[in-house]
C-alpha cells in the first residue's frame, strides 16, 4: 500500500505539472472559407514591417503579399492567419491591406489548440497516438459490413489529398526524422551518441508541450484541454466536430508539411552527412509516425464544455467514465486512412516489423478494450515513473542543451492533444524503440545489453495503452471472460514473437498466430454494434495486407512463406537483399531475449488485468480525504498526523525509497538501453566512411593499375625503342667500323651531306613555316576582308538608314509645310470670315437702322392714315348732315350737296363761307378731290404695306443669315481651335521628331566615327599585314632561290663526292700499296735493328774486351750503317714506318680550313668536277704533278688512303721526326674530291664529315629529296669552279713545311650556314698562314672578321645566296691531302641560322682570281 500511496502522489504531481503545460488559445472562434480552412479567403499586402512576439506569428516586411486562410473571431478579431511562401502564422489586421477578396461568405467555427502551435524553429516529429487510437477504436467500430464502405468513403474523401501532398509530406517527415535521430552526432557534444536516441523523445515531447508562457487566465482552459474536460458533450456537438477537425487537419497537415520543408532545407544545409547516413533507416521508421502524426492532428479537438476539474478531467485524462465520447472520436478516428496512405506511398522504405507490431498491438488493445478486465495501473505507473518520465526528464535536459546549441531540428507546430501526456510519452518511447529496432538492424554485435530492457519495455508499454481506456467501451462489446483472457494471452505472446522474430526462426508459426489471433479477434469484435469498429477494420486490417502487399512490401523475404497461408500475408519484394541478414540477427537476438523475459511478461499480463477504475477511485479518495483533513486541521495548529494517508511513516519512507530506487533502476536500464545503441551511429558513420574509402581505394587501384599498364606498355615501347636504338647504334657502329676499315673519309663526307640535308630540312621547315605564316596571313587577310565587307555592309546599312531618315525628314518637312500652309490658309479664311462677319454685322446694323426708320415711317404713315380716316369720317358725317339739311331746307339734293361741299370747303379753307351756294358746289368738288386723294392714299398705303412686308421678309432673311453666320463663325472658331491644337501637336511632334532625328543622327554619327576609326585601324592593320606579306613573299622568294641554290650545290657536291669516292678508292689502293711497302720497310728495319742489336752486343763485348785488354781484339771496323747489307740501306734518317705511313704533306695545315670544293684548282683539294682530267694533273708549287707524286719513294703516302681513322692519323702526324719536315714534293696524288675548311662557313659537303652517314654509293638510290633538289642547284657553278687555278703554286708555297696538324675533334659542331659556291675565295693575294700552334686549336674568334678582307658576319637569320667572307680565304692545300675536321668549338661559334652578308665578296675580285 505504501508503494501505491507513493505512486498516487507522484501521479498527482505529474498530472498537475502536465496540466500547467497546456497551451493557450488565442481565440475560441475562427472564420474560414470552408470547413477545412483550406480555401483562400483573400490576399493582402503588408503596409508595414511586422515581427511577432513568438513563432505563432508571421513575420513580414512592407510590400509582401500574404494569403489569408483564417480570421479569428470573438475576442481577437484583429488577428488573421495566413501564409507567406512556406511560412504560416498570425498577424494583426491593421498591418495589412486587402488587395483581392476570393471568398465573401465566411464560416465560423471553434478553434483548436492545433491552430496555435508554436515550434520555435525546431523539428517537430508527429508521433503515433497509439494510446488513444487503440483505446478508442473499441467505440468506433461499425457493426455492419454494408456501412463500412459508406462510412469509410466519407473519411477517405476527406483525406485523399493531392498526390503531391503525401509525397512532400512523406519526404519531409522522413528527412525531418532522420536529423532528429542524427542530431547529436553532428552537434558534437560530449553525450554525442547518448543523445542520439533521446533527442527524438524530447523533440516529440517538446513539440507536444511547448514551453509557452501561459498567463493565469489560460491555465484553466489548458487544464481542460489537457485533461479533456467537457467530455460528456451532446451528440450534436460531437457530430459538428466530426467534419471540422477532419477538414482542419487536412489544412493543418498541409501547412505543417510546408513548414517541414523549411526545416528540411535547414536540415539539409546543416546535416547532410548524417542525413545521408541514416536516410534509409529513418524512412523505414517514419512511415508509421507520419500516419499517426496526421491522425493525431485531427484528434486534437477542443472540448470547451467542462464538467469539473477533477472528475471530468481525470476521467478524460485517465480514460474511464467517458462513455459519450464515441461520436466525438469518429472525427478523431477519421485519420487512420492517413496512416495507410503514407504507408502505401513510402512502401519501398518501410519495414514489416513495426507494422506488424502496431497491427497486433492495435488488435490486442481493441480486444482488451472489449474485455472488461481489471488490470492494475501499478506496473503501468511504475513503468511511467521509472522509465518514461525519468528518461523524459533526462531527454528534456539533453534536448534543451541541443536547442541551445542549435543542433536539433524541430518543427514549428507542436501538436496539442487531449490524450494523456504519459501515454504520448510512452507511445513516443515505443516509437523510439521501433526506430531503434529498425535503424539498428545492421549492427547487432553490441546489442546484447538492450536485450533485457527492450522486450520488457516494449511489451509493457504496448499493453499499457489499454488500461486507461478500458472503461470507454460499452458493456455490450465485452466478450466472455475466459475467451478474452485466452485471446489476450495469445495475442501478447504472439505479439512478442511477431515483434522479435521476423525471419526464418521457428517463430514464423507464431507470427502466423499473431495475424490469425488478431484477425479473429478483430473479426469477432467487428460484429458488435459500435459505430467505428468497421472503420478501424477498413484502415487497420488492410494496413497489414494492403500496406505491405500493394505498397510497402519492405519486410524480409523469408517471412513470406509463413504468411502465404493467410489472405492478408505480408510480402516483401524490395528490401529482401538488404534486410535478410540484419533481420536474422535481430530476430535471433529478440528471440533469445523473449525466452529470457517470458516470466516477466506473464507477470505483466496478470498486472494488466487488474481493475484500473477501482484502483483509481482508491487512488483519488485519499486525496479528497487529505484535503478534508488539511481543511479540518488548519484551525487546530496545523500539526501533521502520525501517519500519511492512513499509512505509517515507516511504510511511506520505505515506499519512497523503493520507488526512488525503482526510478533509479529504470533510469539506469534506460541509460543502458540508450548506451547500447551508441555504437550505431558511429558504426554507420564508420561504415559509410569505410565504404567511401574502399570505393576511393578501388578507384585509385583501378587508376593505378591503368597507369601501371600504361607505364608497362610505355616501358615495353621504350625498351623496344631502346633495343631498336641499340641495334641501330650497334649497326651504325659496325657500319662505322667497316667504313673506318674501308675508308674514314667517306664517313666525313656523309656527315657533311647530313649537315647539308639538315640544313635543307631546316630550310624546308622554315619554308613550311613561311607557308603556314602565309596561310595564316591569307586567313587573316580573308577575315579582315570579311570584316571590311561586314563594315562596308554596315556602313551601307547606316547610309541607307541615314537616307531613310533624310527621306523621312523631307517628308516631315513637306508635311509640316503643308500643315503650315493649311494653317495660314485657315487663318486667312478665318480672317476673311471675320471680315465678312463684320460686314454682315454692319449690314445688319444698317438694316436694323432701316427697320427702325421704316417702323418710324410706318408709324407716321399709320398716324396720317388715321388722321385721314378720321377726316374722312368727319367729312362723311358732315355730308350726311348736309343731306339732312337739304331735306330740311327742301332744296335740291344736289344743290344741298354742293352747298355742303362748298360749306365744308369753305369751312376748311375759310374762304367761301360767306357764299353758301358756291360753297356747296365747292364742297362737292372738294369731296371728289378728297375721294381721289383717299384712293391715292390707299394705294400708297398698300405700297407701304407691301414694302413693310418685304422689309420684314428681308429682316427675317437677314436674321436667318446672321444666325447662319454666327453658327458658321462658331464652327469656324471650333475648327480654328482644332486646327490650332493640331498645329501645336504637329509642332510638338516636329520638335520630338527633330530631337529623335538629332539623337539618331548623333548615334549614327558616333557609330560612323567608331566604325570609321575601326575601319582605319583595320586598314592600318591591313597595310601592316600587306607589308608583312610583301616581306614574307620576298623572304619566301629568297628562300626559294636559296633552296634552289642549295639543291644545285647539293647536286654538285654529290657529283663531286662521287668523283671523290672514285679517287678515294684509288687512293685506298695506293695507300694499300704504300702500306705494303711500309711493311716491307718495317720488316727490313726490324731485321736491321736485330742485326744492329747483334752488332751492338758484339761491339759491347768487344769494347769490354778492349777495356780489359786493348790489344785483345784487333778486328777491322766494318761499315756501321750497313748500307750494303742484304736488307738495303738503313732508313734511320727517315721517319719510322708507322709515322711515315700517315704523315701528311704540308698542305695538312690547310686541312681545318677545308675550303669549298668549288674553289679553283680543285677547291683546295682538287677540282670538283670528276670529268675534268686536268684537275688530276694539278702541279704544286714545285711543279710536281699528282702523277709524279705517286712514285715518290721517299714520301709517305697520303693519309686519306690510310685504313686508320683520321684522328689516329692526326695524332700520329702531330709530331714529325726531329729534323724532318714535310716534303712538298713527296705528296701522294691528289684526289680532287676531298676538301675541308675551318672557316666555319658552309664550304661544301666536307663540313659534314663528322656525322655518320651511309656512303654515297648507297645513297644513290635512296637520296633524300632535299639532296636531289639541291643537286640541281649545285650544277650551276661546276663549269666555273672546276678550272685549275694558277695561284695554286704560290698558295701551296705558303703552306710549306713546319705546320703540325691539330688533333681532330670527334664530333663537329653546327656549321655556319654559308653558301660555298661563290668565287670570292679564289681572289686576294696569297699570304702566309698563322702560326701552327694556334691555327687549328684556336676558335674562330682567333681570326676576327676585321682582320681579313670582306664584310664581317651579320647576325641575322636569313641565309644569303652568296657566301660571306668573315674569314680569310685560305689557299687550297696541295692536291691529294684531305685534312681532318677541326674542333667542334670552332664550328659552333655561330648558330646555323646566322649568315654574315657576303654580297660584296661575291662580285669583288672574281676576274683577277680567274686570271691568276
Curated annotation (Swiss-Prot):
Residues in SH3 domain copies? 39-101
**Matching InterPro entries, A to Z?**
cTAGE_MIA/OTOR, MIA2_SH3, SH3-like_dom_sf, SH3_domain
Where is it found, in Gene Ontology cellular component terms? endoplasmic reticulum; endoplasmic reticulum exit site; endoplasmic reticulum membrane; membrane
Q: Which residues cross the membrane?
A: 647-667
Residues linked to a glycan: 59, 368
Task: Spell out the family assignment given in the record's similarity comment.
Answer: Belongs to the MIA/OTOR family.
Write down what this protein is called: Melanoma inhibitory activity protein 2
Q: What organism does this protein naturally occur in?
A: Homo sapiens (Human)
Upper lineage is:
Eukaryota, Metazoa, Chordata, Craniata, Vertebrata
Amino acid at each position: 500500500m505504501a508503494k501505491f500511496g507513493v505512486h498516487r502522489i507522484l501521479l498527482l504531481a505529474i498530472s498537475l505539472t502536465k496540466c500547467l503545460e497546456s497551451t493557450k488559445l488565442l481565440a475560441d472562434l475562427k472564420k474560414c472559407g470552408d470547413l477545412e480552412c483550406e480555401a483562400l479567403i483573400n490576399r493582402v499586402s503588408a503596409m508595414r514591417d511586422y515581427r511577432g512576439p513568438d513563432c505563432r506569428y508571421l513575420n513580414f516586411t512592407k510590400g509582401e503579399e500574404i494569403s489569408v486562410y483564417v480570421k479569428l473571431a470573438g475576442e481577437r478579431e484583429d488577428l488573421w492567419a495566413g501564409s507567406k511562401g512556406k511560412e504560416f502564422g498570425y498577424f494583426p489586421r491593421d498591418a495589412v491591406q486587402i488587395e483581392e477578396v476570393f471568398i465573401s461568405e465566411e464560416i465560423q467555427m471553434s478553434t483548436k489548440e492545433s491552430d496555435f502551435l508554436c515550434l520555435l524553429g525546431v523539428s517537430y516529429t508527429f508521433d503515433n497516438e497509439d494510446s488513444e487510437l487503440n483505446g478508442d477504436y473499441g467505440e468506433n467500430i461499425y457493426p455492419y459490413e454494408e456501412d463500412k464502405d459508406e462510412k469509410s468513403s466519407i473519411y477517405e474523401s476527406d483525406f485523399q489529398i493531392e498526390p503531391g501532398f503525401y509525397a512532400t509530406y512523406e519526404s519531409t517527415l522522413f528527412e525531418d526524422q532522420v536529423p532528429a535521430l542524427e542530431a547529436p552526432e553532428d552537434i558534437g557534444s560530449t553525450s554525442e551518441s547518448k543523445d542520439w536516441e533521446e533527442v527524438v523523445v524530447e523533440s516529440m515531447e517538446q513539440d507536444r508541450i511547448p514551453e509557452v508562457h501561459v498567463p493565469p487566465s489560460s491555465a484553466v482552459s489548458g487544464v481542460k484541454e489537457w485533461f479533456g474536460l467537457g467530455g460528456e458533450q451532446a451528440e450534436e456537438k460531437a457530430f459538428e466536430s466530426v467534419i471540422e477537425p477532419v477538414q482542419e487537419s487536412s489544412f493543418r497537415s498541409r501547412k505543417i508539411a510546408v513548414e517541414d520543408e523549411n526545416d528540411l532545407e535547414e536540415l539539409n544545409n546543416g546535416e547532410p552527412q548524417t542525413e545521408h547516413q541514416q536516410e534509409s533507416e529513418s524512412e523505414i521508421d517514419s512511415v508509421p509516425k507520419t500516419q499517426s502524426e496526421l491522425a493525431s492532428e485531427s484528434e486534437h479537438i477542443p472540448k470547451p464544455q467542462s464538467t469539473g476539474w477533477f472528475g471530468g478531467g481525470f476521467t478524460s485524462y485517465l480514460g474511464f467514465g467517458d462513455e459519450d465520447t464515441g461520436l466525438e472520436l469518429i472525427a478523431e478516428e477519421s485519420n487512420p486512412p492517413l496512416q495507410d496512405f503514407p504507408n502505401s506511398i513510402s512502401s519501398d522504405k518501410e519495414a514489416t516489423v513495426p507494422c506488424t507490431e502496431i497491427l497486433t498491438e492495435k488488435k490486442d488493445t481493441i480486444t482488451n478494450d472489449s474485455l472488461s478486465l481489471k488490470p492494475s495501473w501499478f506496473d503501468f505507473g511504475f513503468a511511467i515513473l521509472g522509465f518514461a518520465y525519468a528518461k523524459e526528464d533526462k531527454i528534456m535536459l539533453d534536448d534543451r542543451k541541443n536547442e541551445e546549441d542549435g543542433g536539433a531540428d524541430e518543427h514549428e507546430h507542436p501538436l496539442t492533444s487531449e490524450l494523456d501526456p504519459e501515454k504520448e510519452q510512452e507511445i513516443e518511447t515505443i516509437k523510439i524503440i521501433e526506430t531503434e529496432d529498425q535503424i539498428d538492424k545492421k549492427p547487432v554485435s553490441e546489442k546484447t545489453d538492450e536485450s533485457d530492457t527492450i522486450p520488457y519495455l516494449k511489451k509493457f508499454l504496448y499493453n499499457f495503452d489499454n488500461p486507461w481506456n478500458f472503461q470507454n467501451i460499452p458493456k455490450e462489446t465485452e466478450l466472455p471472460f475466459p475467451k478474452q483472457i485466452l485471446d489476450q494471452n495469445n495475442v501478447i505472446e504472439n505479439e512478442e514473437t511477431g515483434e522479435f522474430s521476423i525471419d526464418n526462426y521457428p517463430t514464423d508459426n507464431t507470427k502466423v498466430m499473431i495475424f490469425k489471433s488478431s484477425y479473429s479477434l478483430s473479426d469477432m469484435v467487428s460484429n458488435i454494434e459500435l459505430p467505428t469498429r468497421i472503420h478501424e477494420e477498413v484502415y487497420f486490417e488492410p494496413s497489414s495486407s494492403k500496406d505491405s502487399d500493394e505498397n510497402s512490401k519492405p519486410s524480409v523475404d523469408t517471412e513470406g512463406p509463413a504468411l502465404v497461408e493467410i489472405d492478408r500475408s505480408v510480402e516483401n519484394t524490395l528490401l529482401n537483399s538488404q534486410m535478410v541478414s540484419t533481420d536474422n540477427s535481430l530476430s535471433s537476438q529478440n528471440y533469445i531475449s523473449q525466452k529470457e523475459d517470458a516470466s516477466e511478461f506473464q507477470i505483466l499480463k496478470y498486472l494488466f488485468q487488474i481493475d484500473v477504475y477501482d484502483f483509481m477511485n482508491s487512488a483519488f479518495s485519499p486525496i479528497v480525504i487529505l484535503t478534508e483533513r488539511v481543511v479540518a486541521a488548519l484551525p487546530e495548529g496545523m500539526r501533521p498526523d502520525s501517519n500519511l494517508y492512513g499509512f505509517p511513516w515507516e511504510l511511506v519512507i520505505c515506499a519512497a525509497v523503493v520507488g526512488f530506487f525503482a526510478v533509479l533502476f529504470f533510469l539506469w536500464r534506460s541509460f543502458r538501453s540508450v548506451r547500447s545503441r551508441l555504437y550505431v551511429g558511429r558504426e554507420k558513420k564508420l561504415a559509410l566512411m569505410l565504404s567511401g574509402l574502399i570505393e576511393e581505394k578501388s578507384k585509385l587501384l583501378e587508376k593505378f593499375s591503368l597507369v601501371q599498364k600504361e607505364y608497362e606498355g610505355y616501358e615495353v615501347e621504350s625498351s623496344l625503342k631502346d633495343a631498336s636504338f641499340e641495334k641501330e647504334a650497334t649497326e651504325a657502329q659496325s657500319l662505322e667500323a667497316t667504313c673506318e676499315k674501308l675508308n674514314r673519309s667517306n664517313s666525313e663526307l656523309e656527315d657533311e651531306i647530313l649537315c647539308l640535308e639538315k640544313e635543307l630540312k631546316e630550310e624546308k621547315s622554315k619554308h613550311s613555316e613561311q607557308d603556314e605564316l602565309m596561310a595564316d596571313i591569307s586567313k587573316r587577310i580573308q577575315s579582315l576582308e570579311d570584316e571590311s565587307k561586314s563594315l562596308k555592309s554596315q556602313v551601307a546599312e547606316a547610309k541607307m538608314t541615314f537616307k531613310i531618315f533624310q527621306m523621312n525628314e523631307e517628308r516631315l518637312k513637306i508635311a509640316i509645310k503643308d500643315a503650315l500652309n493649311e494653317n495660314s490658309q485657315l487663318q486667312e479664311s478665318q480672317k476673311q470670315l471675320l471680315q465678312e462677319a463684320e460686314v454682315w454685322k454692319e449690314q445688319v446694323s444698317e438694316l436694323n437702322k432701316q427697320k427702325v426708320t421704316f417702323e418710324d415711317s410706318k408709324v407716321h404713315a399709320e398716324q396720317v392714315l388715321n388722321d385721314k380716316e378720321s377726316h374722312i369720317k368727319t367729312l362723311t358725317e358732315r355730308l350726311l348732315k348736309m343731306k339732312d339739311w337739304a331735306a330740311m331746307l327742301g332744296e335740291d339734293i344736289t344743290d344741298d350737296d354742293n352747298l355742303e361741299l362748298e360749306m365744308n370747303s369753305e369751312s376748311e379753307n375759310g374762304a367761301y363761307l360767306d357764299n353758301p351756294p358756291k360753297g356747296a358746289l365747292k364742297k362737292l368738288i372738294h369731296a371728289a378731290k378728297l375721294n381721289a386723294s383717299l384712293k391715292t392714299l390707299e394705294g400708297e398705303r398698300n405700297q407701304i404695306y407691301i414694302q413693310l412686308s418685304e422689309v420684314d421678309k428681308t429682316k427675317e432673311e437677314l436674321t436667318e443669315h446672321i444666325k447662319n453666320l454666327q453658327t458658321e463663325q462658331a464652327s469656324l472658331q471650333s475648327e480654328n481651335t482644332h486646327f490650332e491644337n493640331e498645329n501645336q501637336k504637329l509642332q510638338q511632334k516636329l520638335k520630338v521628331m527633330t530631337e529623335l532625328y538629332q539623337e539618331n543622327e548623333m548615334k549614327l554619327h558616333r557609330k560612323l566615327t567608331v566604325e570609321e576609326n575601326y575601319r582605319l585601324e583595320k586598314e592600318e592593320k591591313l597595310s601592316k599585314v600587306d607589308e608583312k606579306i610583301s616581306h614574307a613573299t620576298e623572304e619566301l622568294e629568297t628562300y626559294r632561290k636559296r633552296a634552289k641554290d642549295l639543291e644545285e650545290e647539293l647536286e654538285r657536291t654529290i657529283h663531286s663526292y662521287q668523283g671523290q669516292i672514285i679517287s678515294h678508292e684509288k687512293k685506298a689502293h695506293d695507300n694499300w700499296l704504300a702500306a705494303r711497302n711500309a711493311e716491307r720497310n718495317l720488316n727490313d728495319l726490324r731485321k736491321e735493328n736485330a742485326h744492329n742489336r747483334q752488332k751492338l752486343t758484339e761491339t759491347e763485348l768487344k769494347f769490354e774486351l778492349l777495356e780489359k785488354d786493348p790489344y785483345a781484339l784487333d778486328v777491322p771496323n766494318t761499315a756501321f750503317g750497313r748500307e750494303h747489307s742484304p736488307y738495303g740501306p738503313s732508313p734511320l734518317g727517315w721517319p719510322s714506318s708507322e709515322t711515315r705511313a700517315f704523315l701528311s704533306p704540308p698542305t695538312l695545315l690547310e686541312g681545318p680550313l677545308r675550303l669549298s670544293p668549288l674553289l679553283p684548282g680543285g677547291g683546295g683539294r682538287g677540282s670538283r668536277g670528276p670529268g675534268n682530267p686536268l684537275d688530276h694533273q694539278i702541279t704544286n708549287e714545285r711543279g710536281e704533278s699528282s702523277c709524279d707524286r705517286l712514285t715518290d719513294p721517299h714520301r709517305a703516302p697520303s693519309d686519306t688512303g690510310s685504313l686508320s681513322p683520321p684522328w689516329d692519323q692526326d695524332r700520329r702526324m702531330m709530331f714529325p721526326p726531329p729534323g724532318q719536315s714535310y716534303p712538298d714534293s713527296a705528296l701522294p696524288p691528289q684526289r680532287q674530291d676531298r676538301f675541308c675548311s675551318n672557316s666555319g662557313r658552309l664550304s661544301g659537303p666536307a663540313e659534314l664529315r663528322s656525322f655518320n652517314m651511309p656512303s654515297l654509293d648507297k645513297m644513290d638510290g635512296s637520296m633524300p629529296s632535299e639532296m636531289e633538289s639541291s643537286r640541281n642547284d649545285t650544277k650551276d657553278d661546276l663549269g666555273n669552279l672546276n678550272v685549275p687555278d694558277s695561284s695554286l703554286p704560290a698558295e701551296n708555297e705558303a703552306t710549306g713545311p713546319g705546320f703540325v696538324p691539330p688533333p681532330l675533334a670527334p664530333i663537329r659542331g653546327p656549321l655556319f650556314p654559308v653558301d660555298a659556291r661563290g668565287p670570292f675565295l679564289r681572289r686576294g693575294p696569297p699570304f702566309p698562314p698563322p702560326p701552327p700552334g694556334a691555327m687549328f686549336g684556336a676558335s674562330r674568334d682567333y681570326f676576327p672578321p676585321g682582320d681579313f678582307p670582306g664584310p664581317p658576319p651579320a647576325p641575322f637569320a636569313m641565309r644569303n645566296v652568296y657566301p660571306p667572307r668573315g674569314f680569310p680565304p685560305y689557299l687550297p692545300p696541295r692536291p691529294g691531302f684531305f685534312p681532318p675536321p677541326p674542333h667542334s668549338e670552332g664550328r659552333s661559334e655561330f648558330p646555323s641560322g646566322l649568315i654574315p652578308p657576303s654580297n660584296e665578296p661575291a662580285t669583288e675580285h672574281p676576274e683577277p682570281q680567274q686570271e691568276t
